């Protein structure tokens, strides 16, 4: 499993995507380069697929040259951005990037397994993802119990678990102005979708449509959707330890653990060069 490629998903320009605090494009590029350099310097992954879904132009050859300096390979992909991301949320866009990368990438196409990391972040204890051979290996965390025992909210959660149901709930909120607290999701568990390892065929069979049910405005995230789908299948290796995360969250705009100054300075220089004409 240590030979599998790492897919990094990136969005430099989030447009009108809701619930994203870090919106400045130059800052996003900087933090993405911090995460990329950390993976190049400190991980076992020798092949990295860097996939982004926005129109910001960069000098992609610099990514390949930077990886080569570490004896590693980077494949750069540009995935078309769906307009539904602005309506359904960042988890929808994330799913579109992963699906597009699996369809277009030469490195991912050759590999039976792949690892995935959200851009801007680095997982220090990523060896936990490679510890055993499962069809999927994920971090699991409990969500606050927000009334799941109610028959009404059990029905609402069932609706969130289908594509048709999730669209109906979103339309009820957006068009009919049904109050949020009547139709919001109340998940009991989440999958930490920032980092996971998955068998390619397993992902395509079980998780490739999970993002289509995401409704961030109603509290039904990609994390909840993944958990609901993985509950129905076998072959999942759950990790209940805390992930040791470095980098800046685009959602919260906060830094979990900062990178060392030397890496941050190199990332700053790389980001400026990437964006230069």
Which residues fall in each region the model found?
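ER/Golgi luminal nucleotide-sugar-dependent glycosyltransferases, focusing on the catalytic module
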Residues: 1-277
């Amino acid at each position: 499993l240590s030979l599998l490629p790492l897919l990094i998903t990136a969005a430099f320009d989030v447009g009108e995507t809701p619930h994203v605090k870090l919106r400045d494009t130059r800052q996003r590029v900087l933090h993405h380069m911090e995460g990329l350099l950390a993976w190049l310097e400190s991980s076992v992954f020798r092949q990295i697929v860097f996939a982004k879904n926005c129109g910001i132009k960069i000098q992609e050859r610099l990514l390949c040259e930077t990886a080569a300096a570490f004896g590693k390979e980077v494949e750069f992909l540009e995935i078309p951005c769906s307009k539904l991301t602005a309506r359904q949320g960042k988890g929808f866009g994330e799913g579109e990037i992963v699906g597009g990368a699996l369809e277009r990438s030469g490195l991912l196409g050759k590999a039976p397994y792949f690892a995935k990391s959200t851009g801007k972040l680095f997982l220090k204890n990523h060896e936990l993802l490679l510890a055993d051979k499962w069809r999927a290996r994920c971090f699991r965390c409990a969500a606050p119990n927000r009334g799941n025992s109610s028959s009404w909210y059990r029905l609402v959660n069932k609706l969130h678990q289908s594509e048709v149901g999730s669209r109906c709930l979103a339309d009820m909120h957006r068009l009919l102005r049904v109050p949020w607290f009547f139709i919001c999701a109340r998940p009991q568990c989440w999958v930490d979708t920032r980092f996971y390892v998955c068998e390619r065929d397993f992902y395509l069979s079980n998780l490739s449509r999970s993002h289509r049910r995401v409704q961030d405005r109603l509290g039904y995230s990609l994390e909840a959707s993944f958990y609901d789908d993985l509950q129905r299948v076998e072959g999942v290796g759950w990790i209940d330890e805390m992930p040791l995360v470095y980098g800046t969250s685009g959602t919260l705009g906060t830094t979990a653990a900062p990178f060392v100054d030397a890496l941050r300075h190199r990332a700053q220089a790389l980001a400026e060069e990437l964006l230069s004409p």
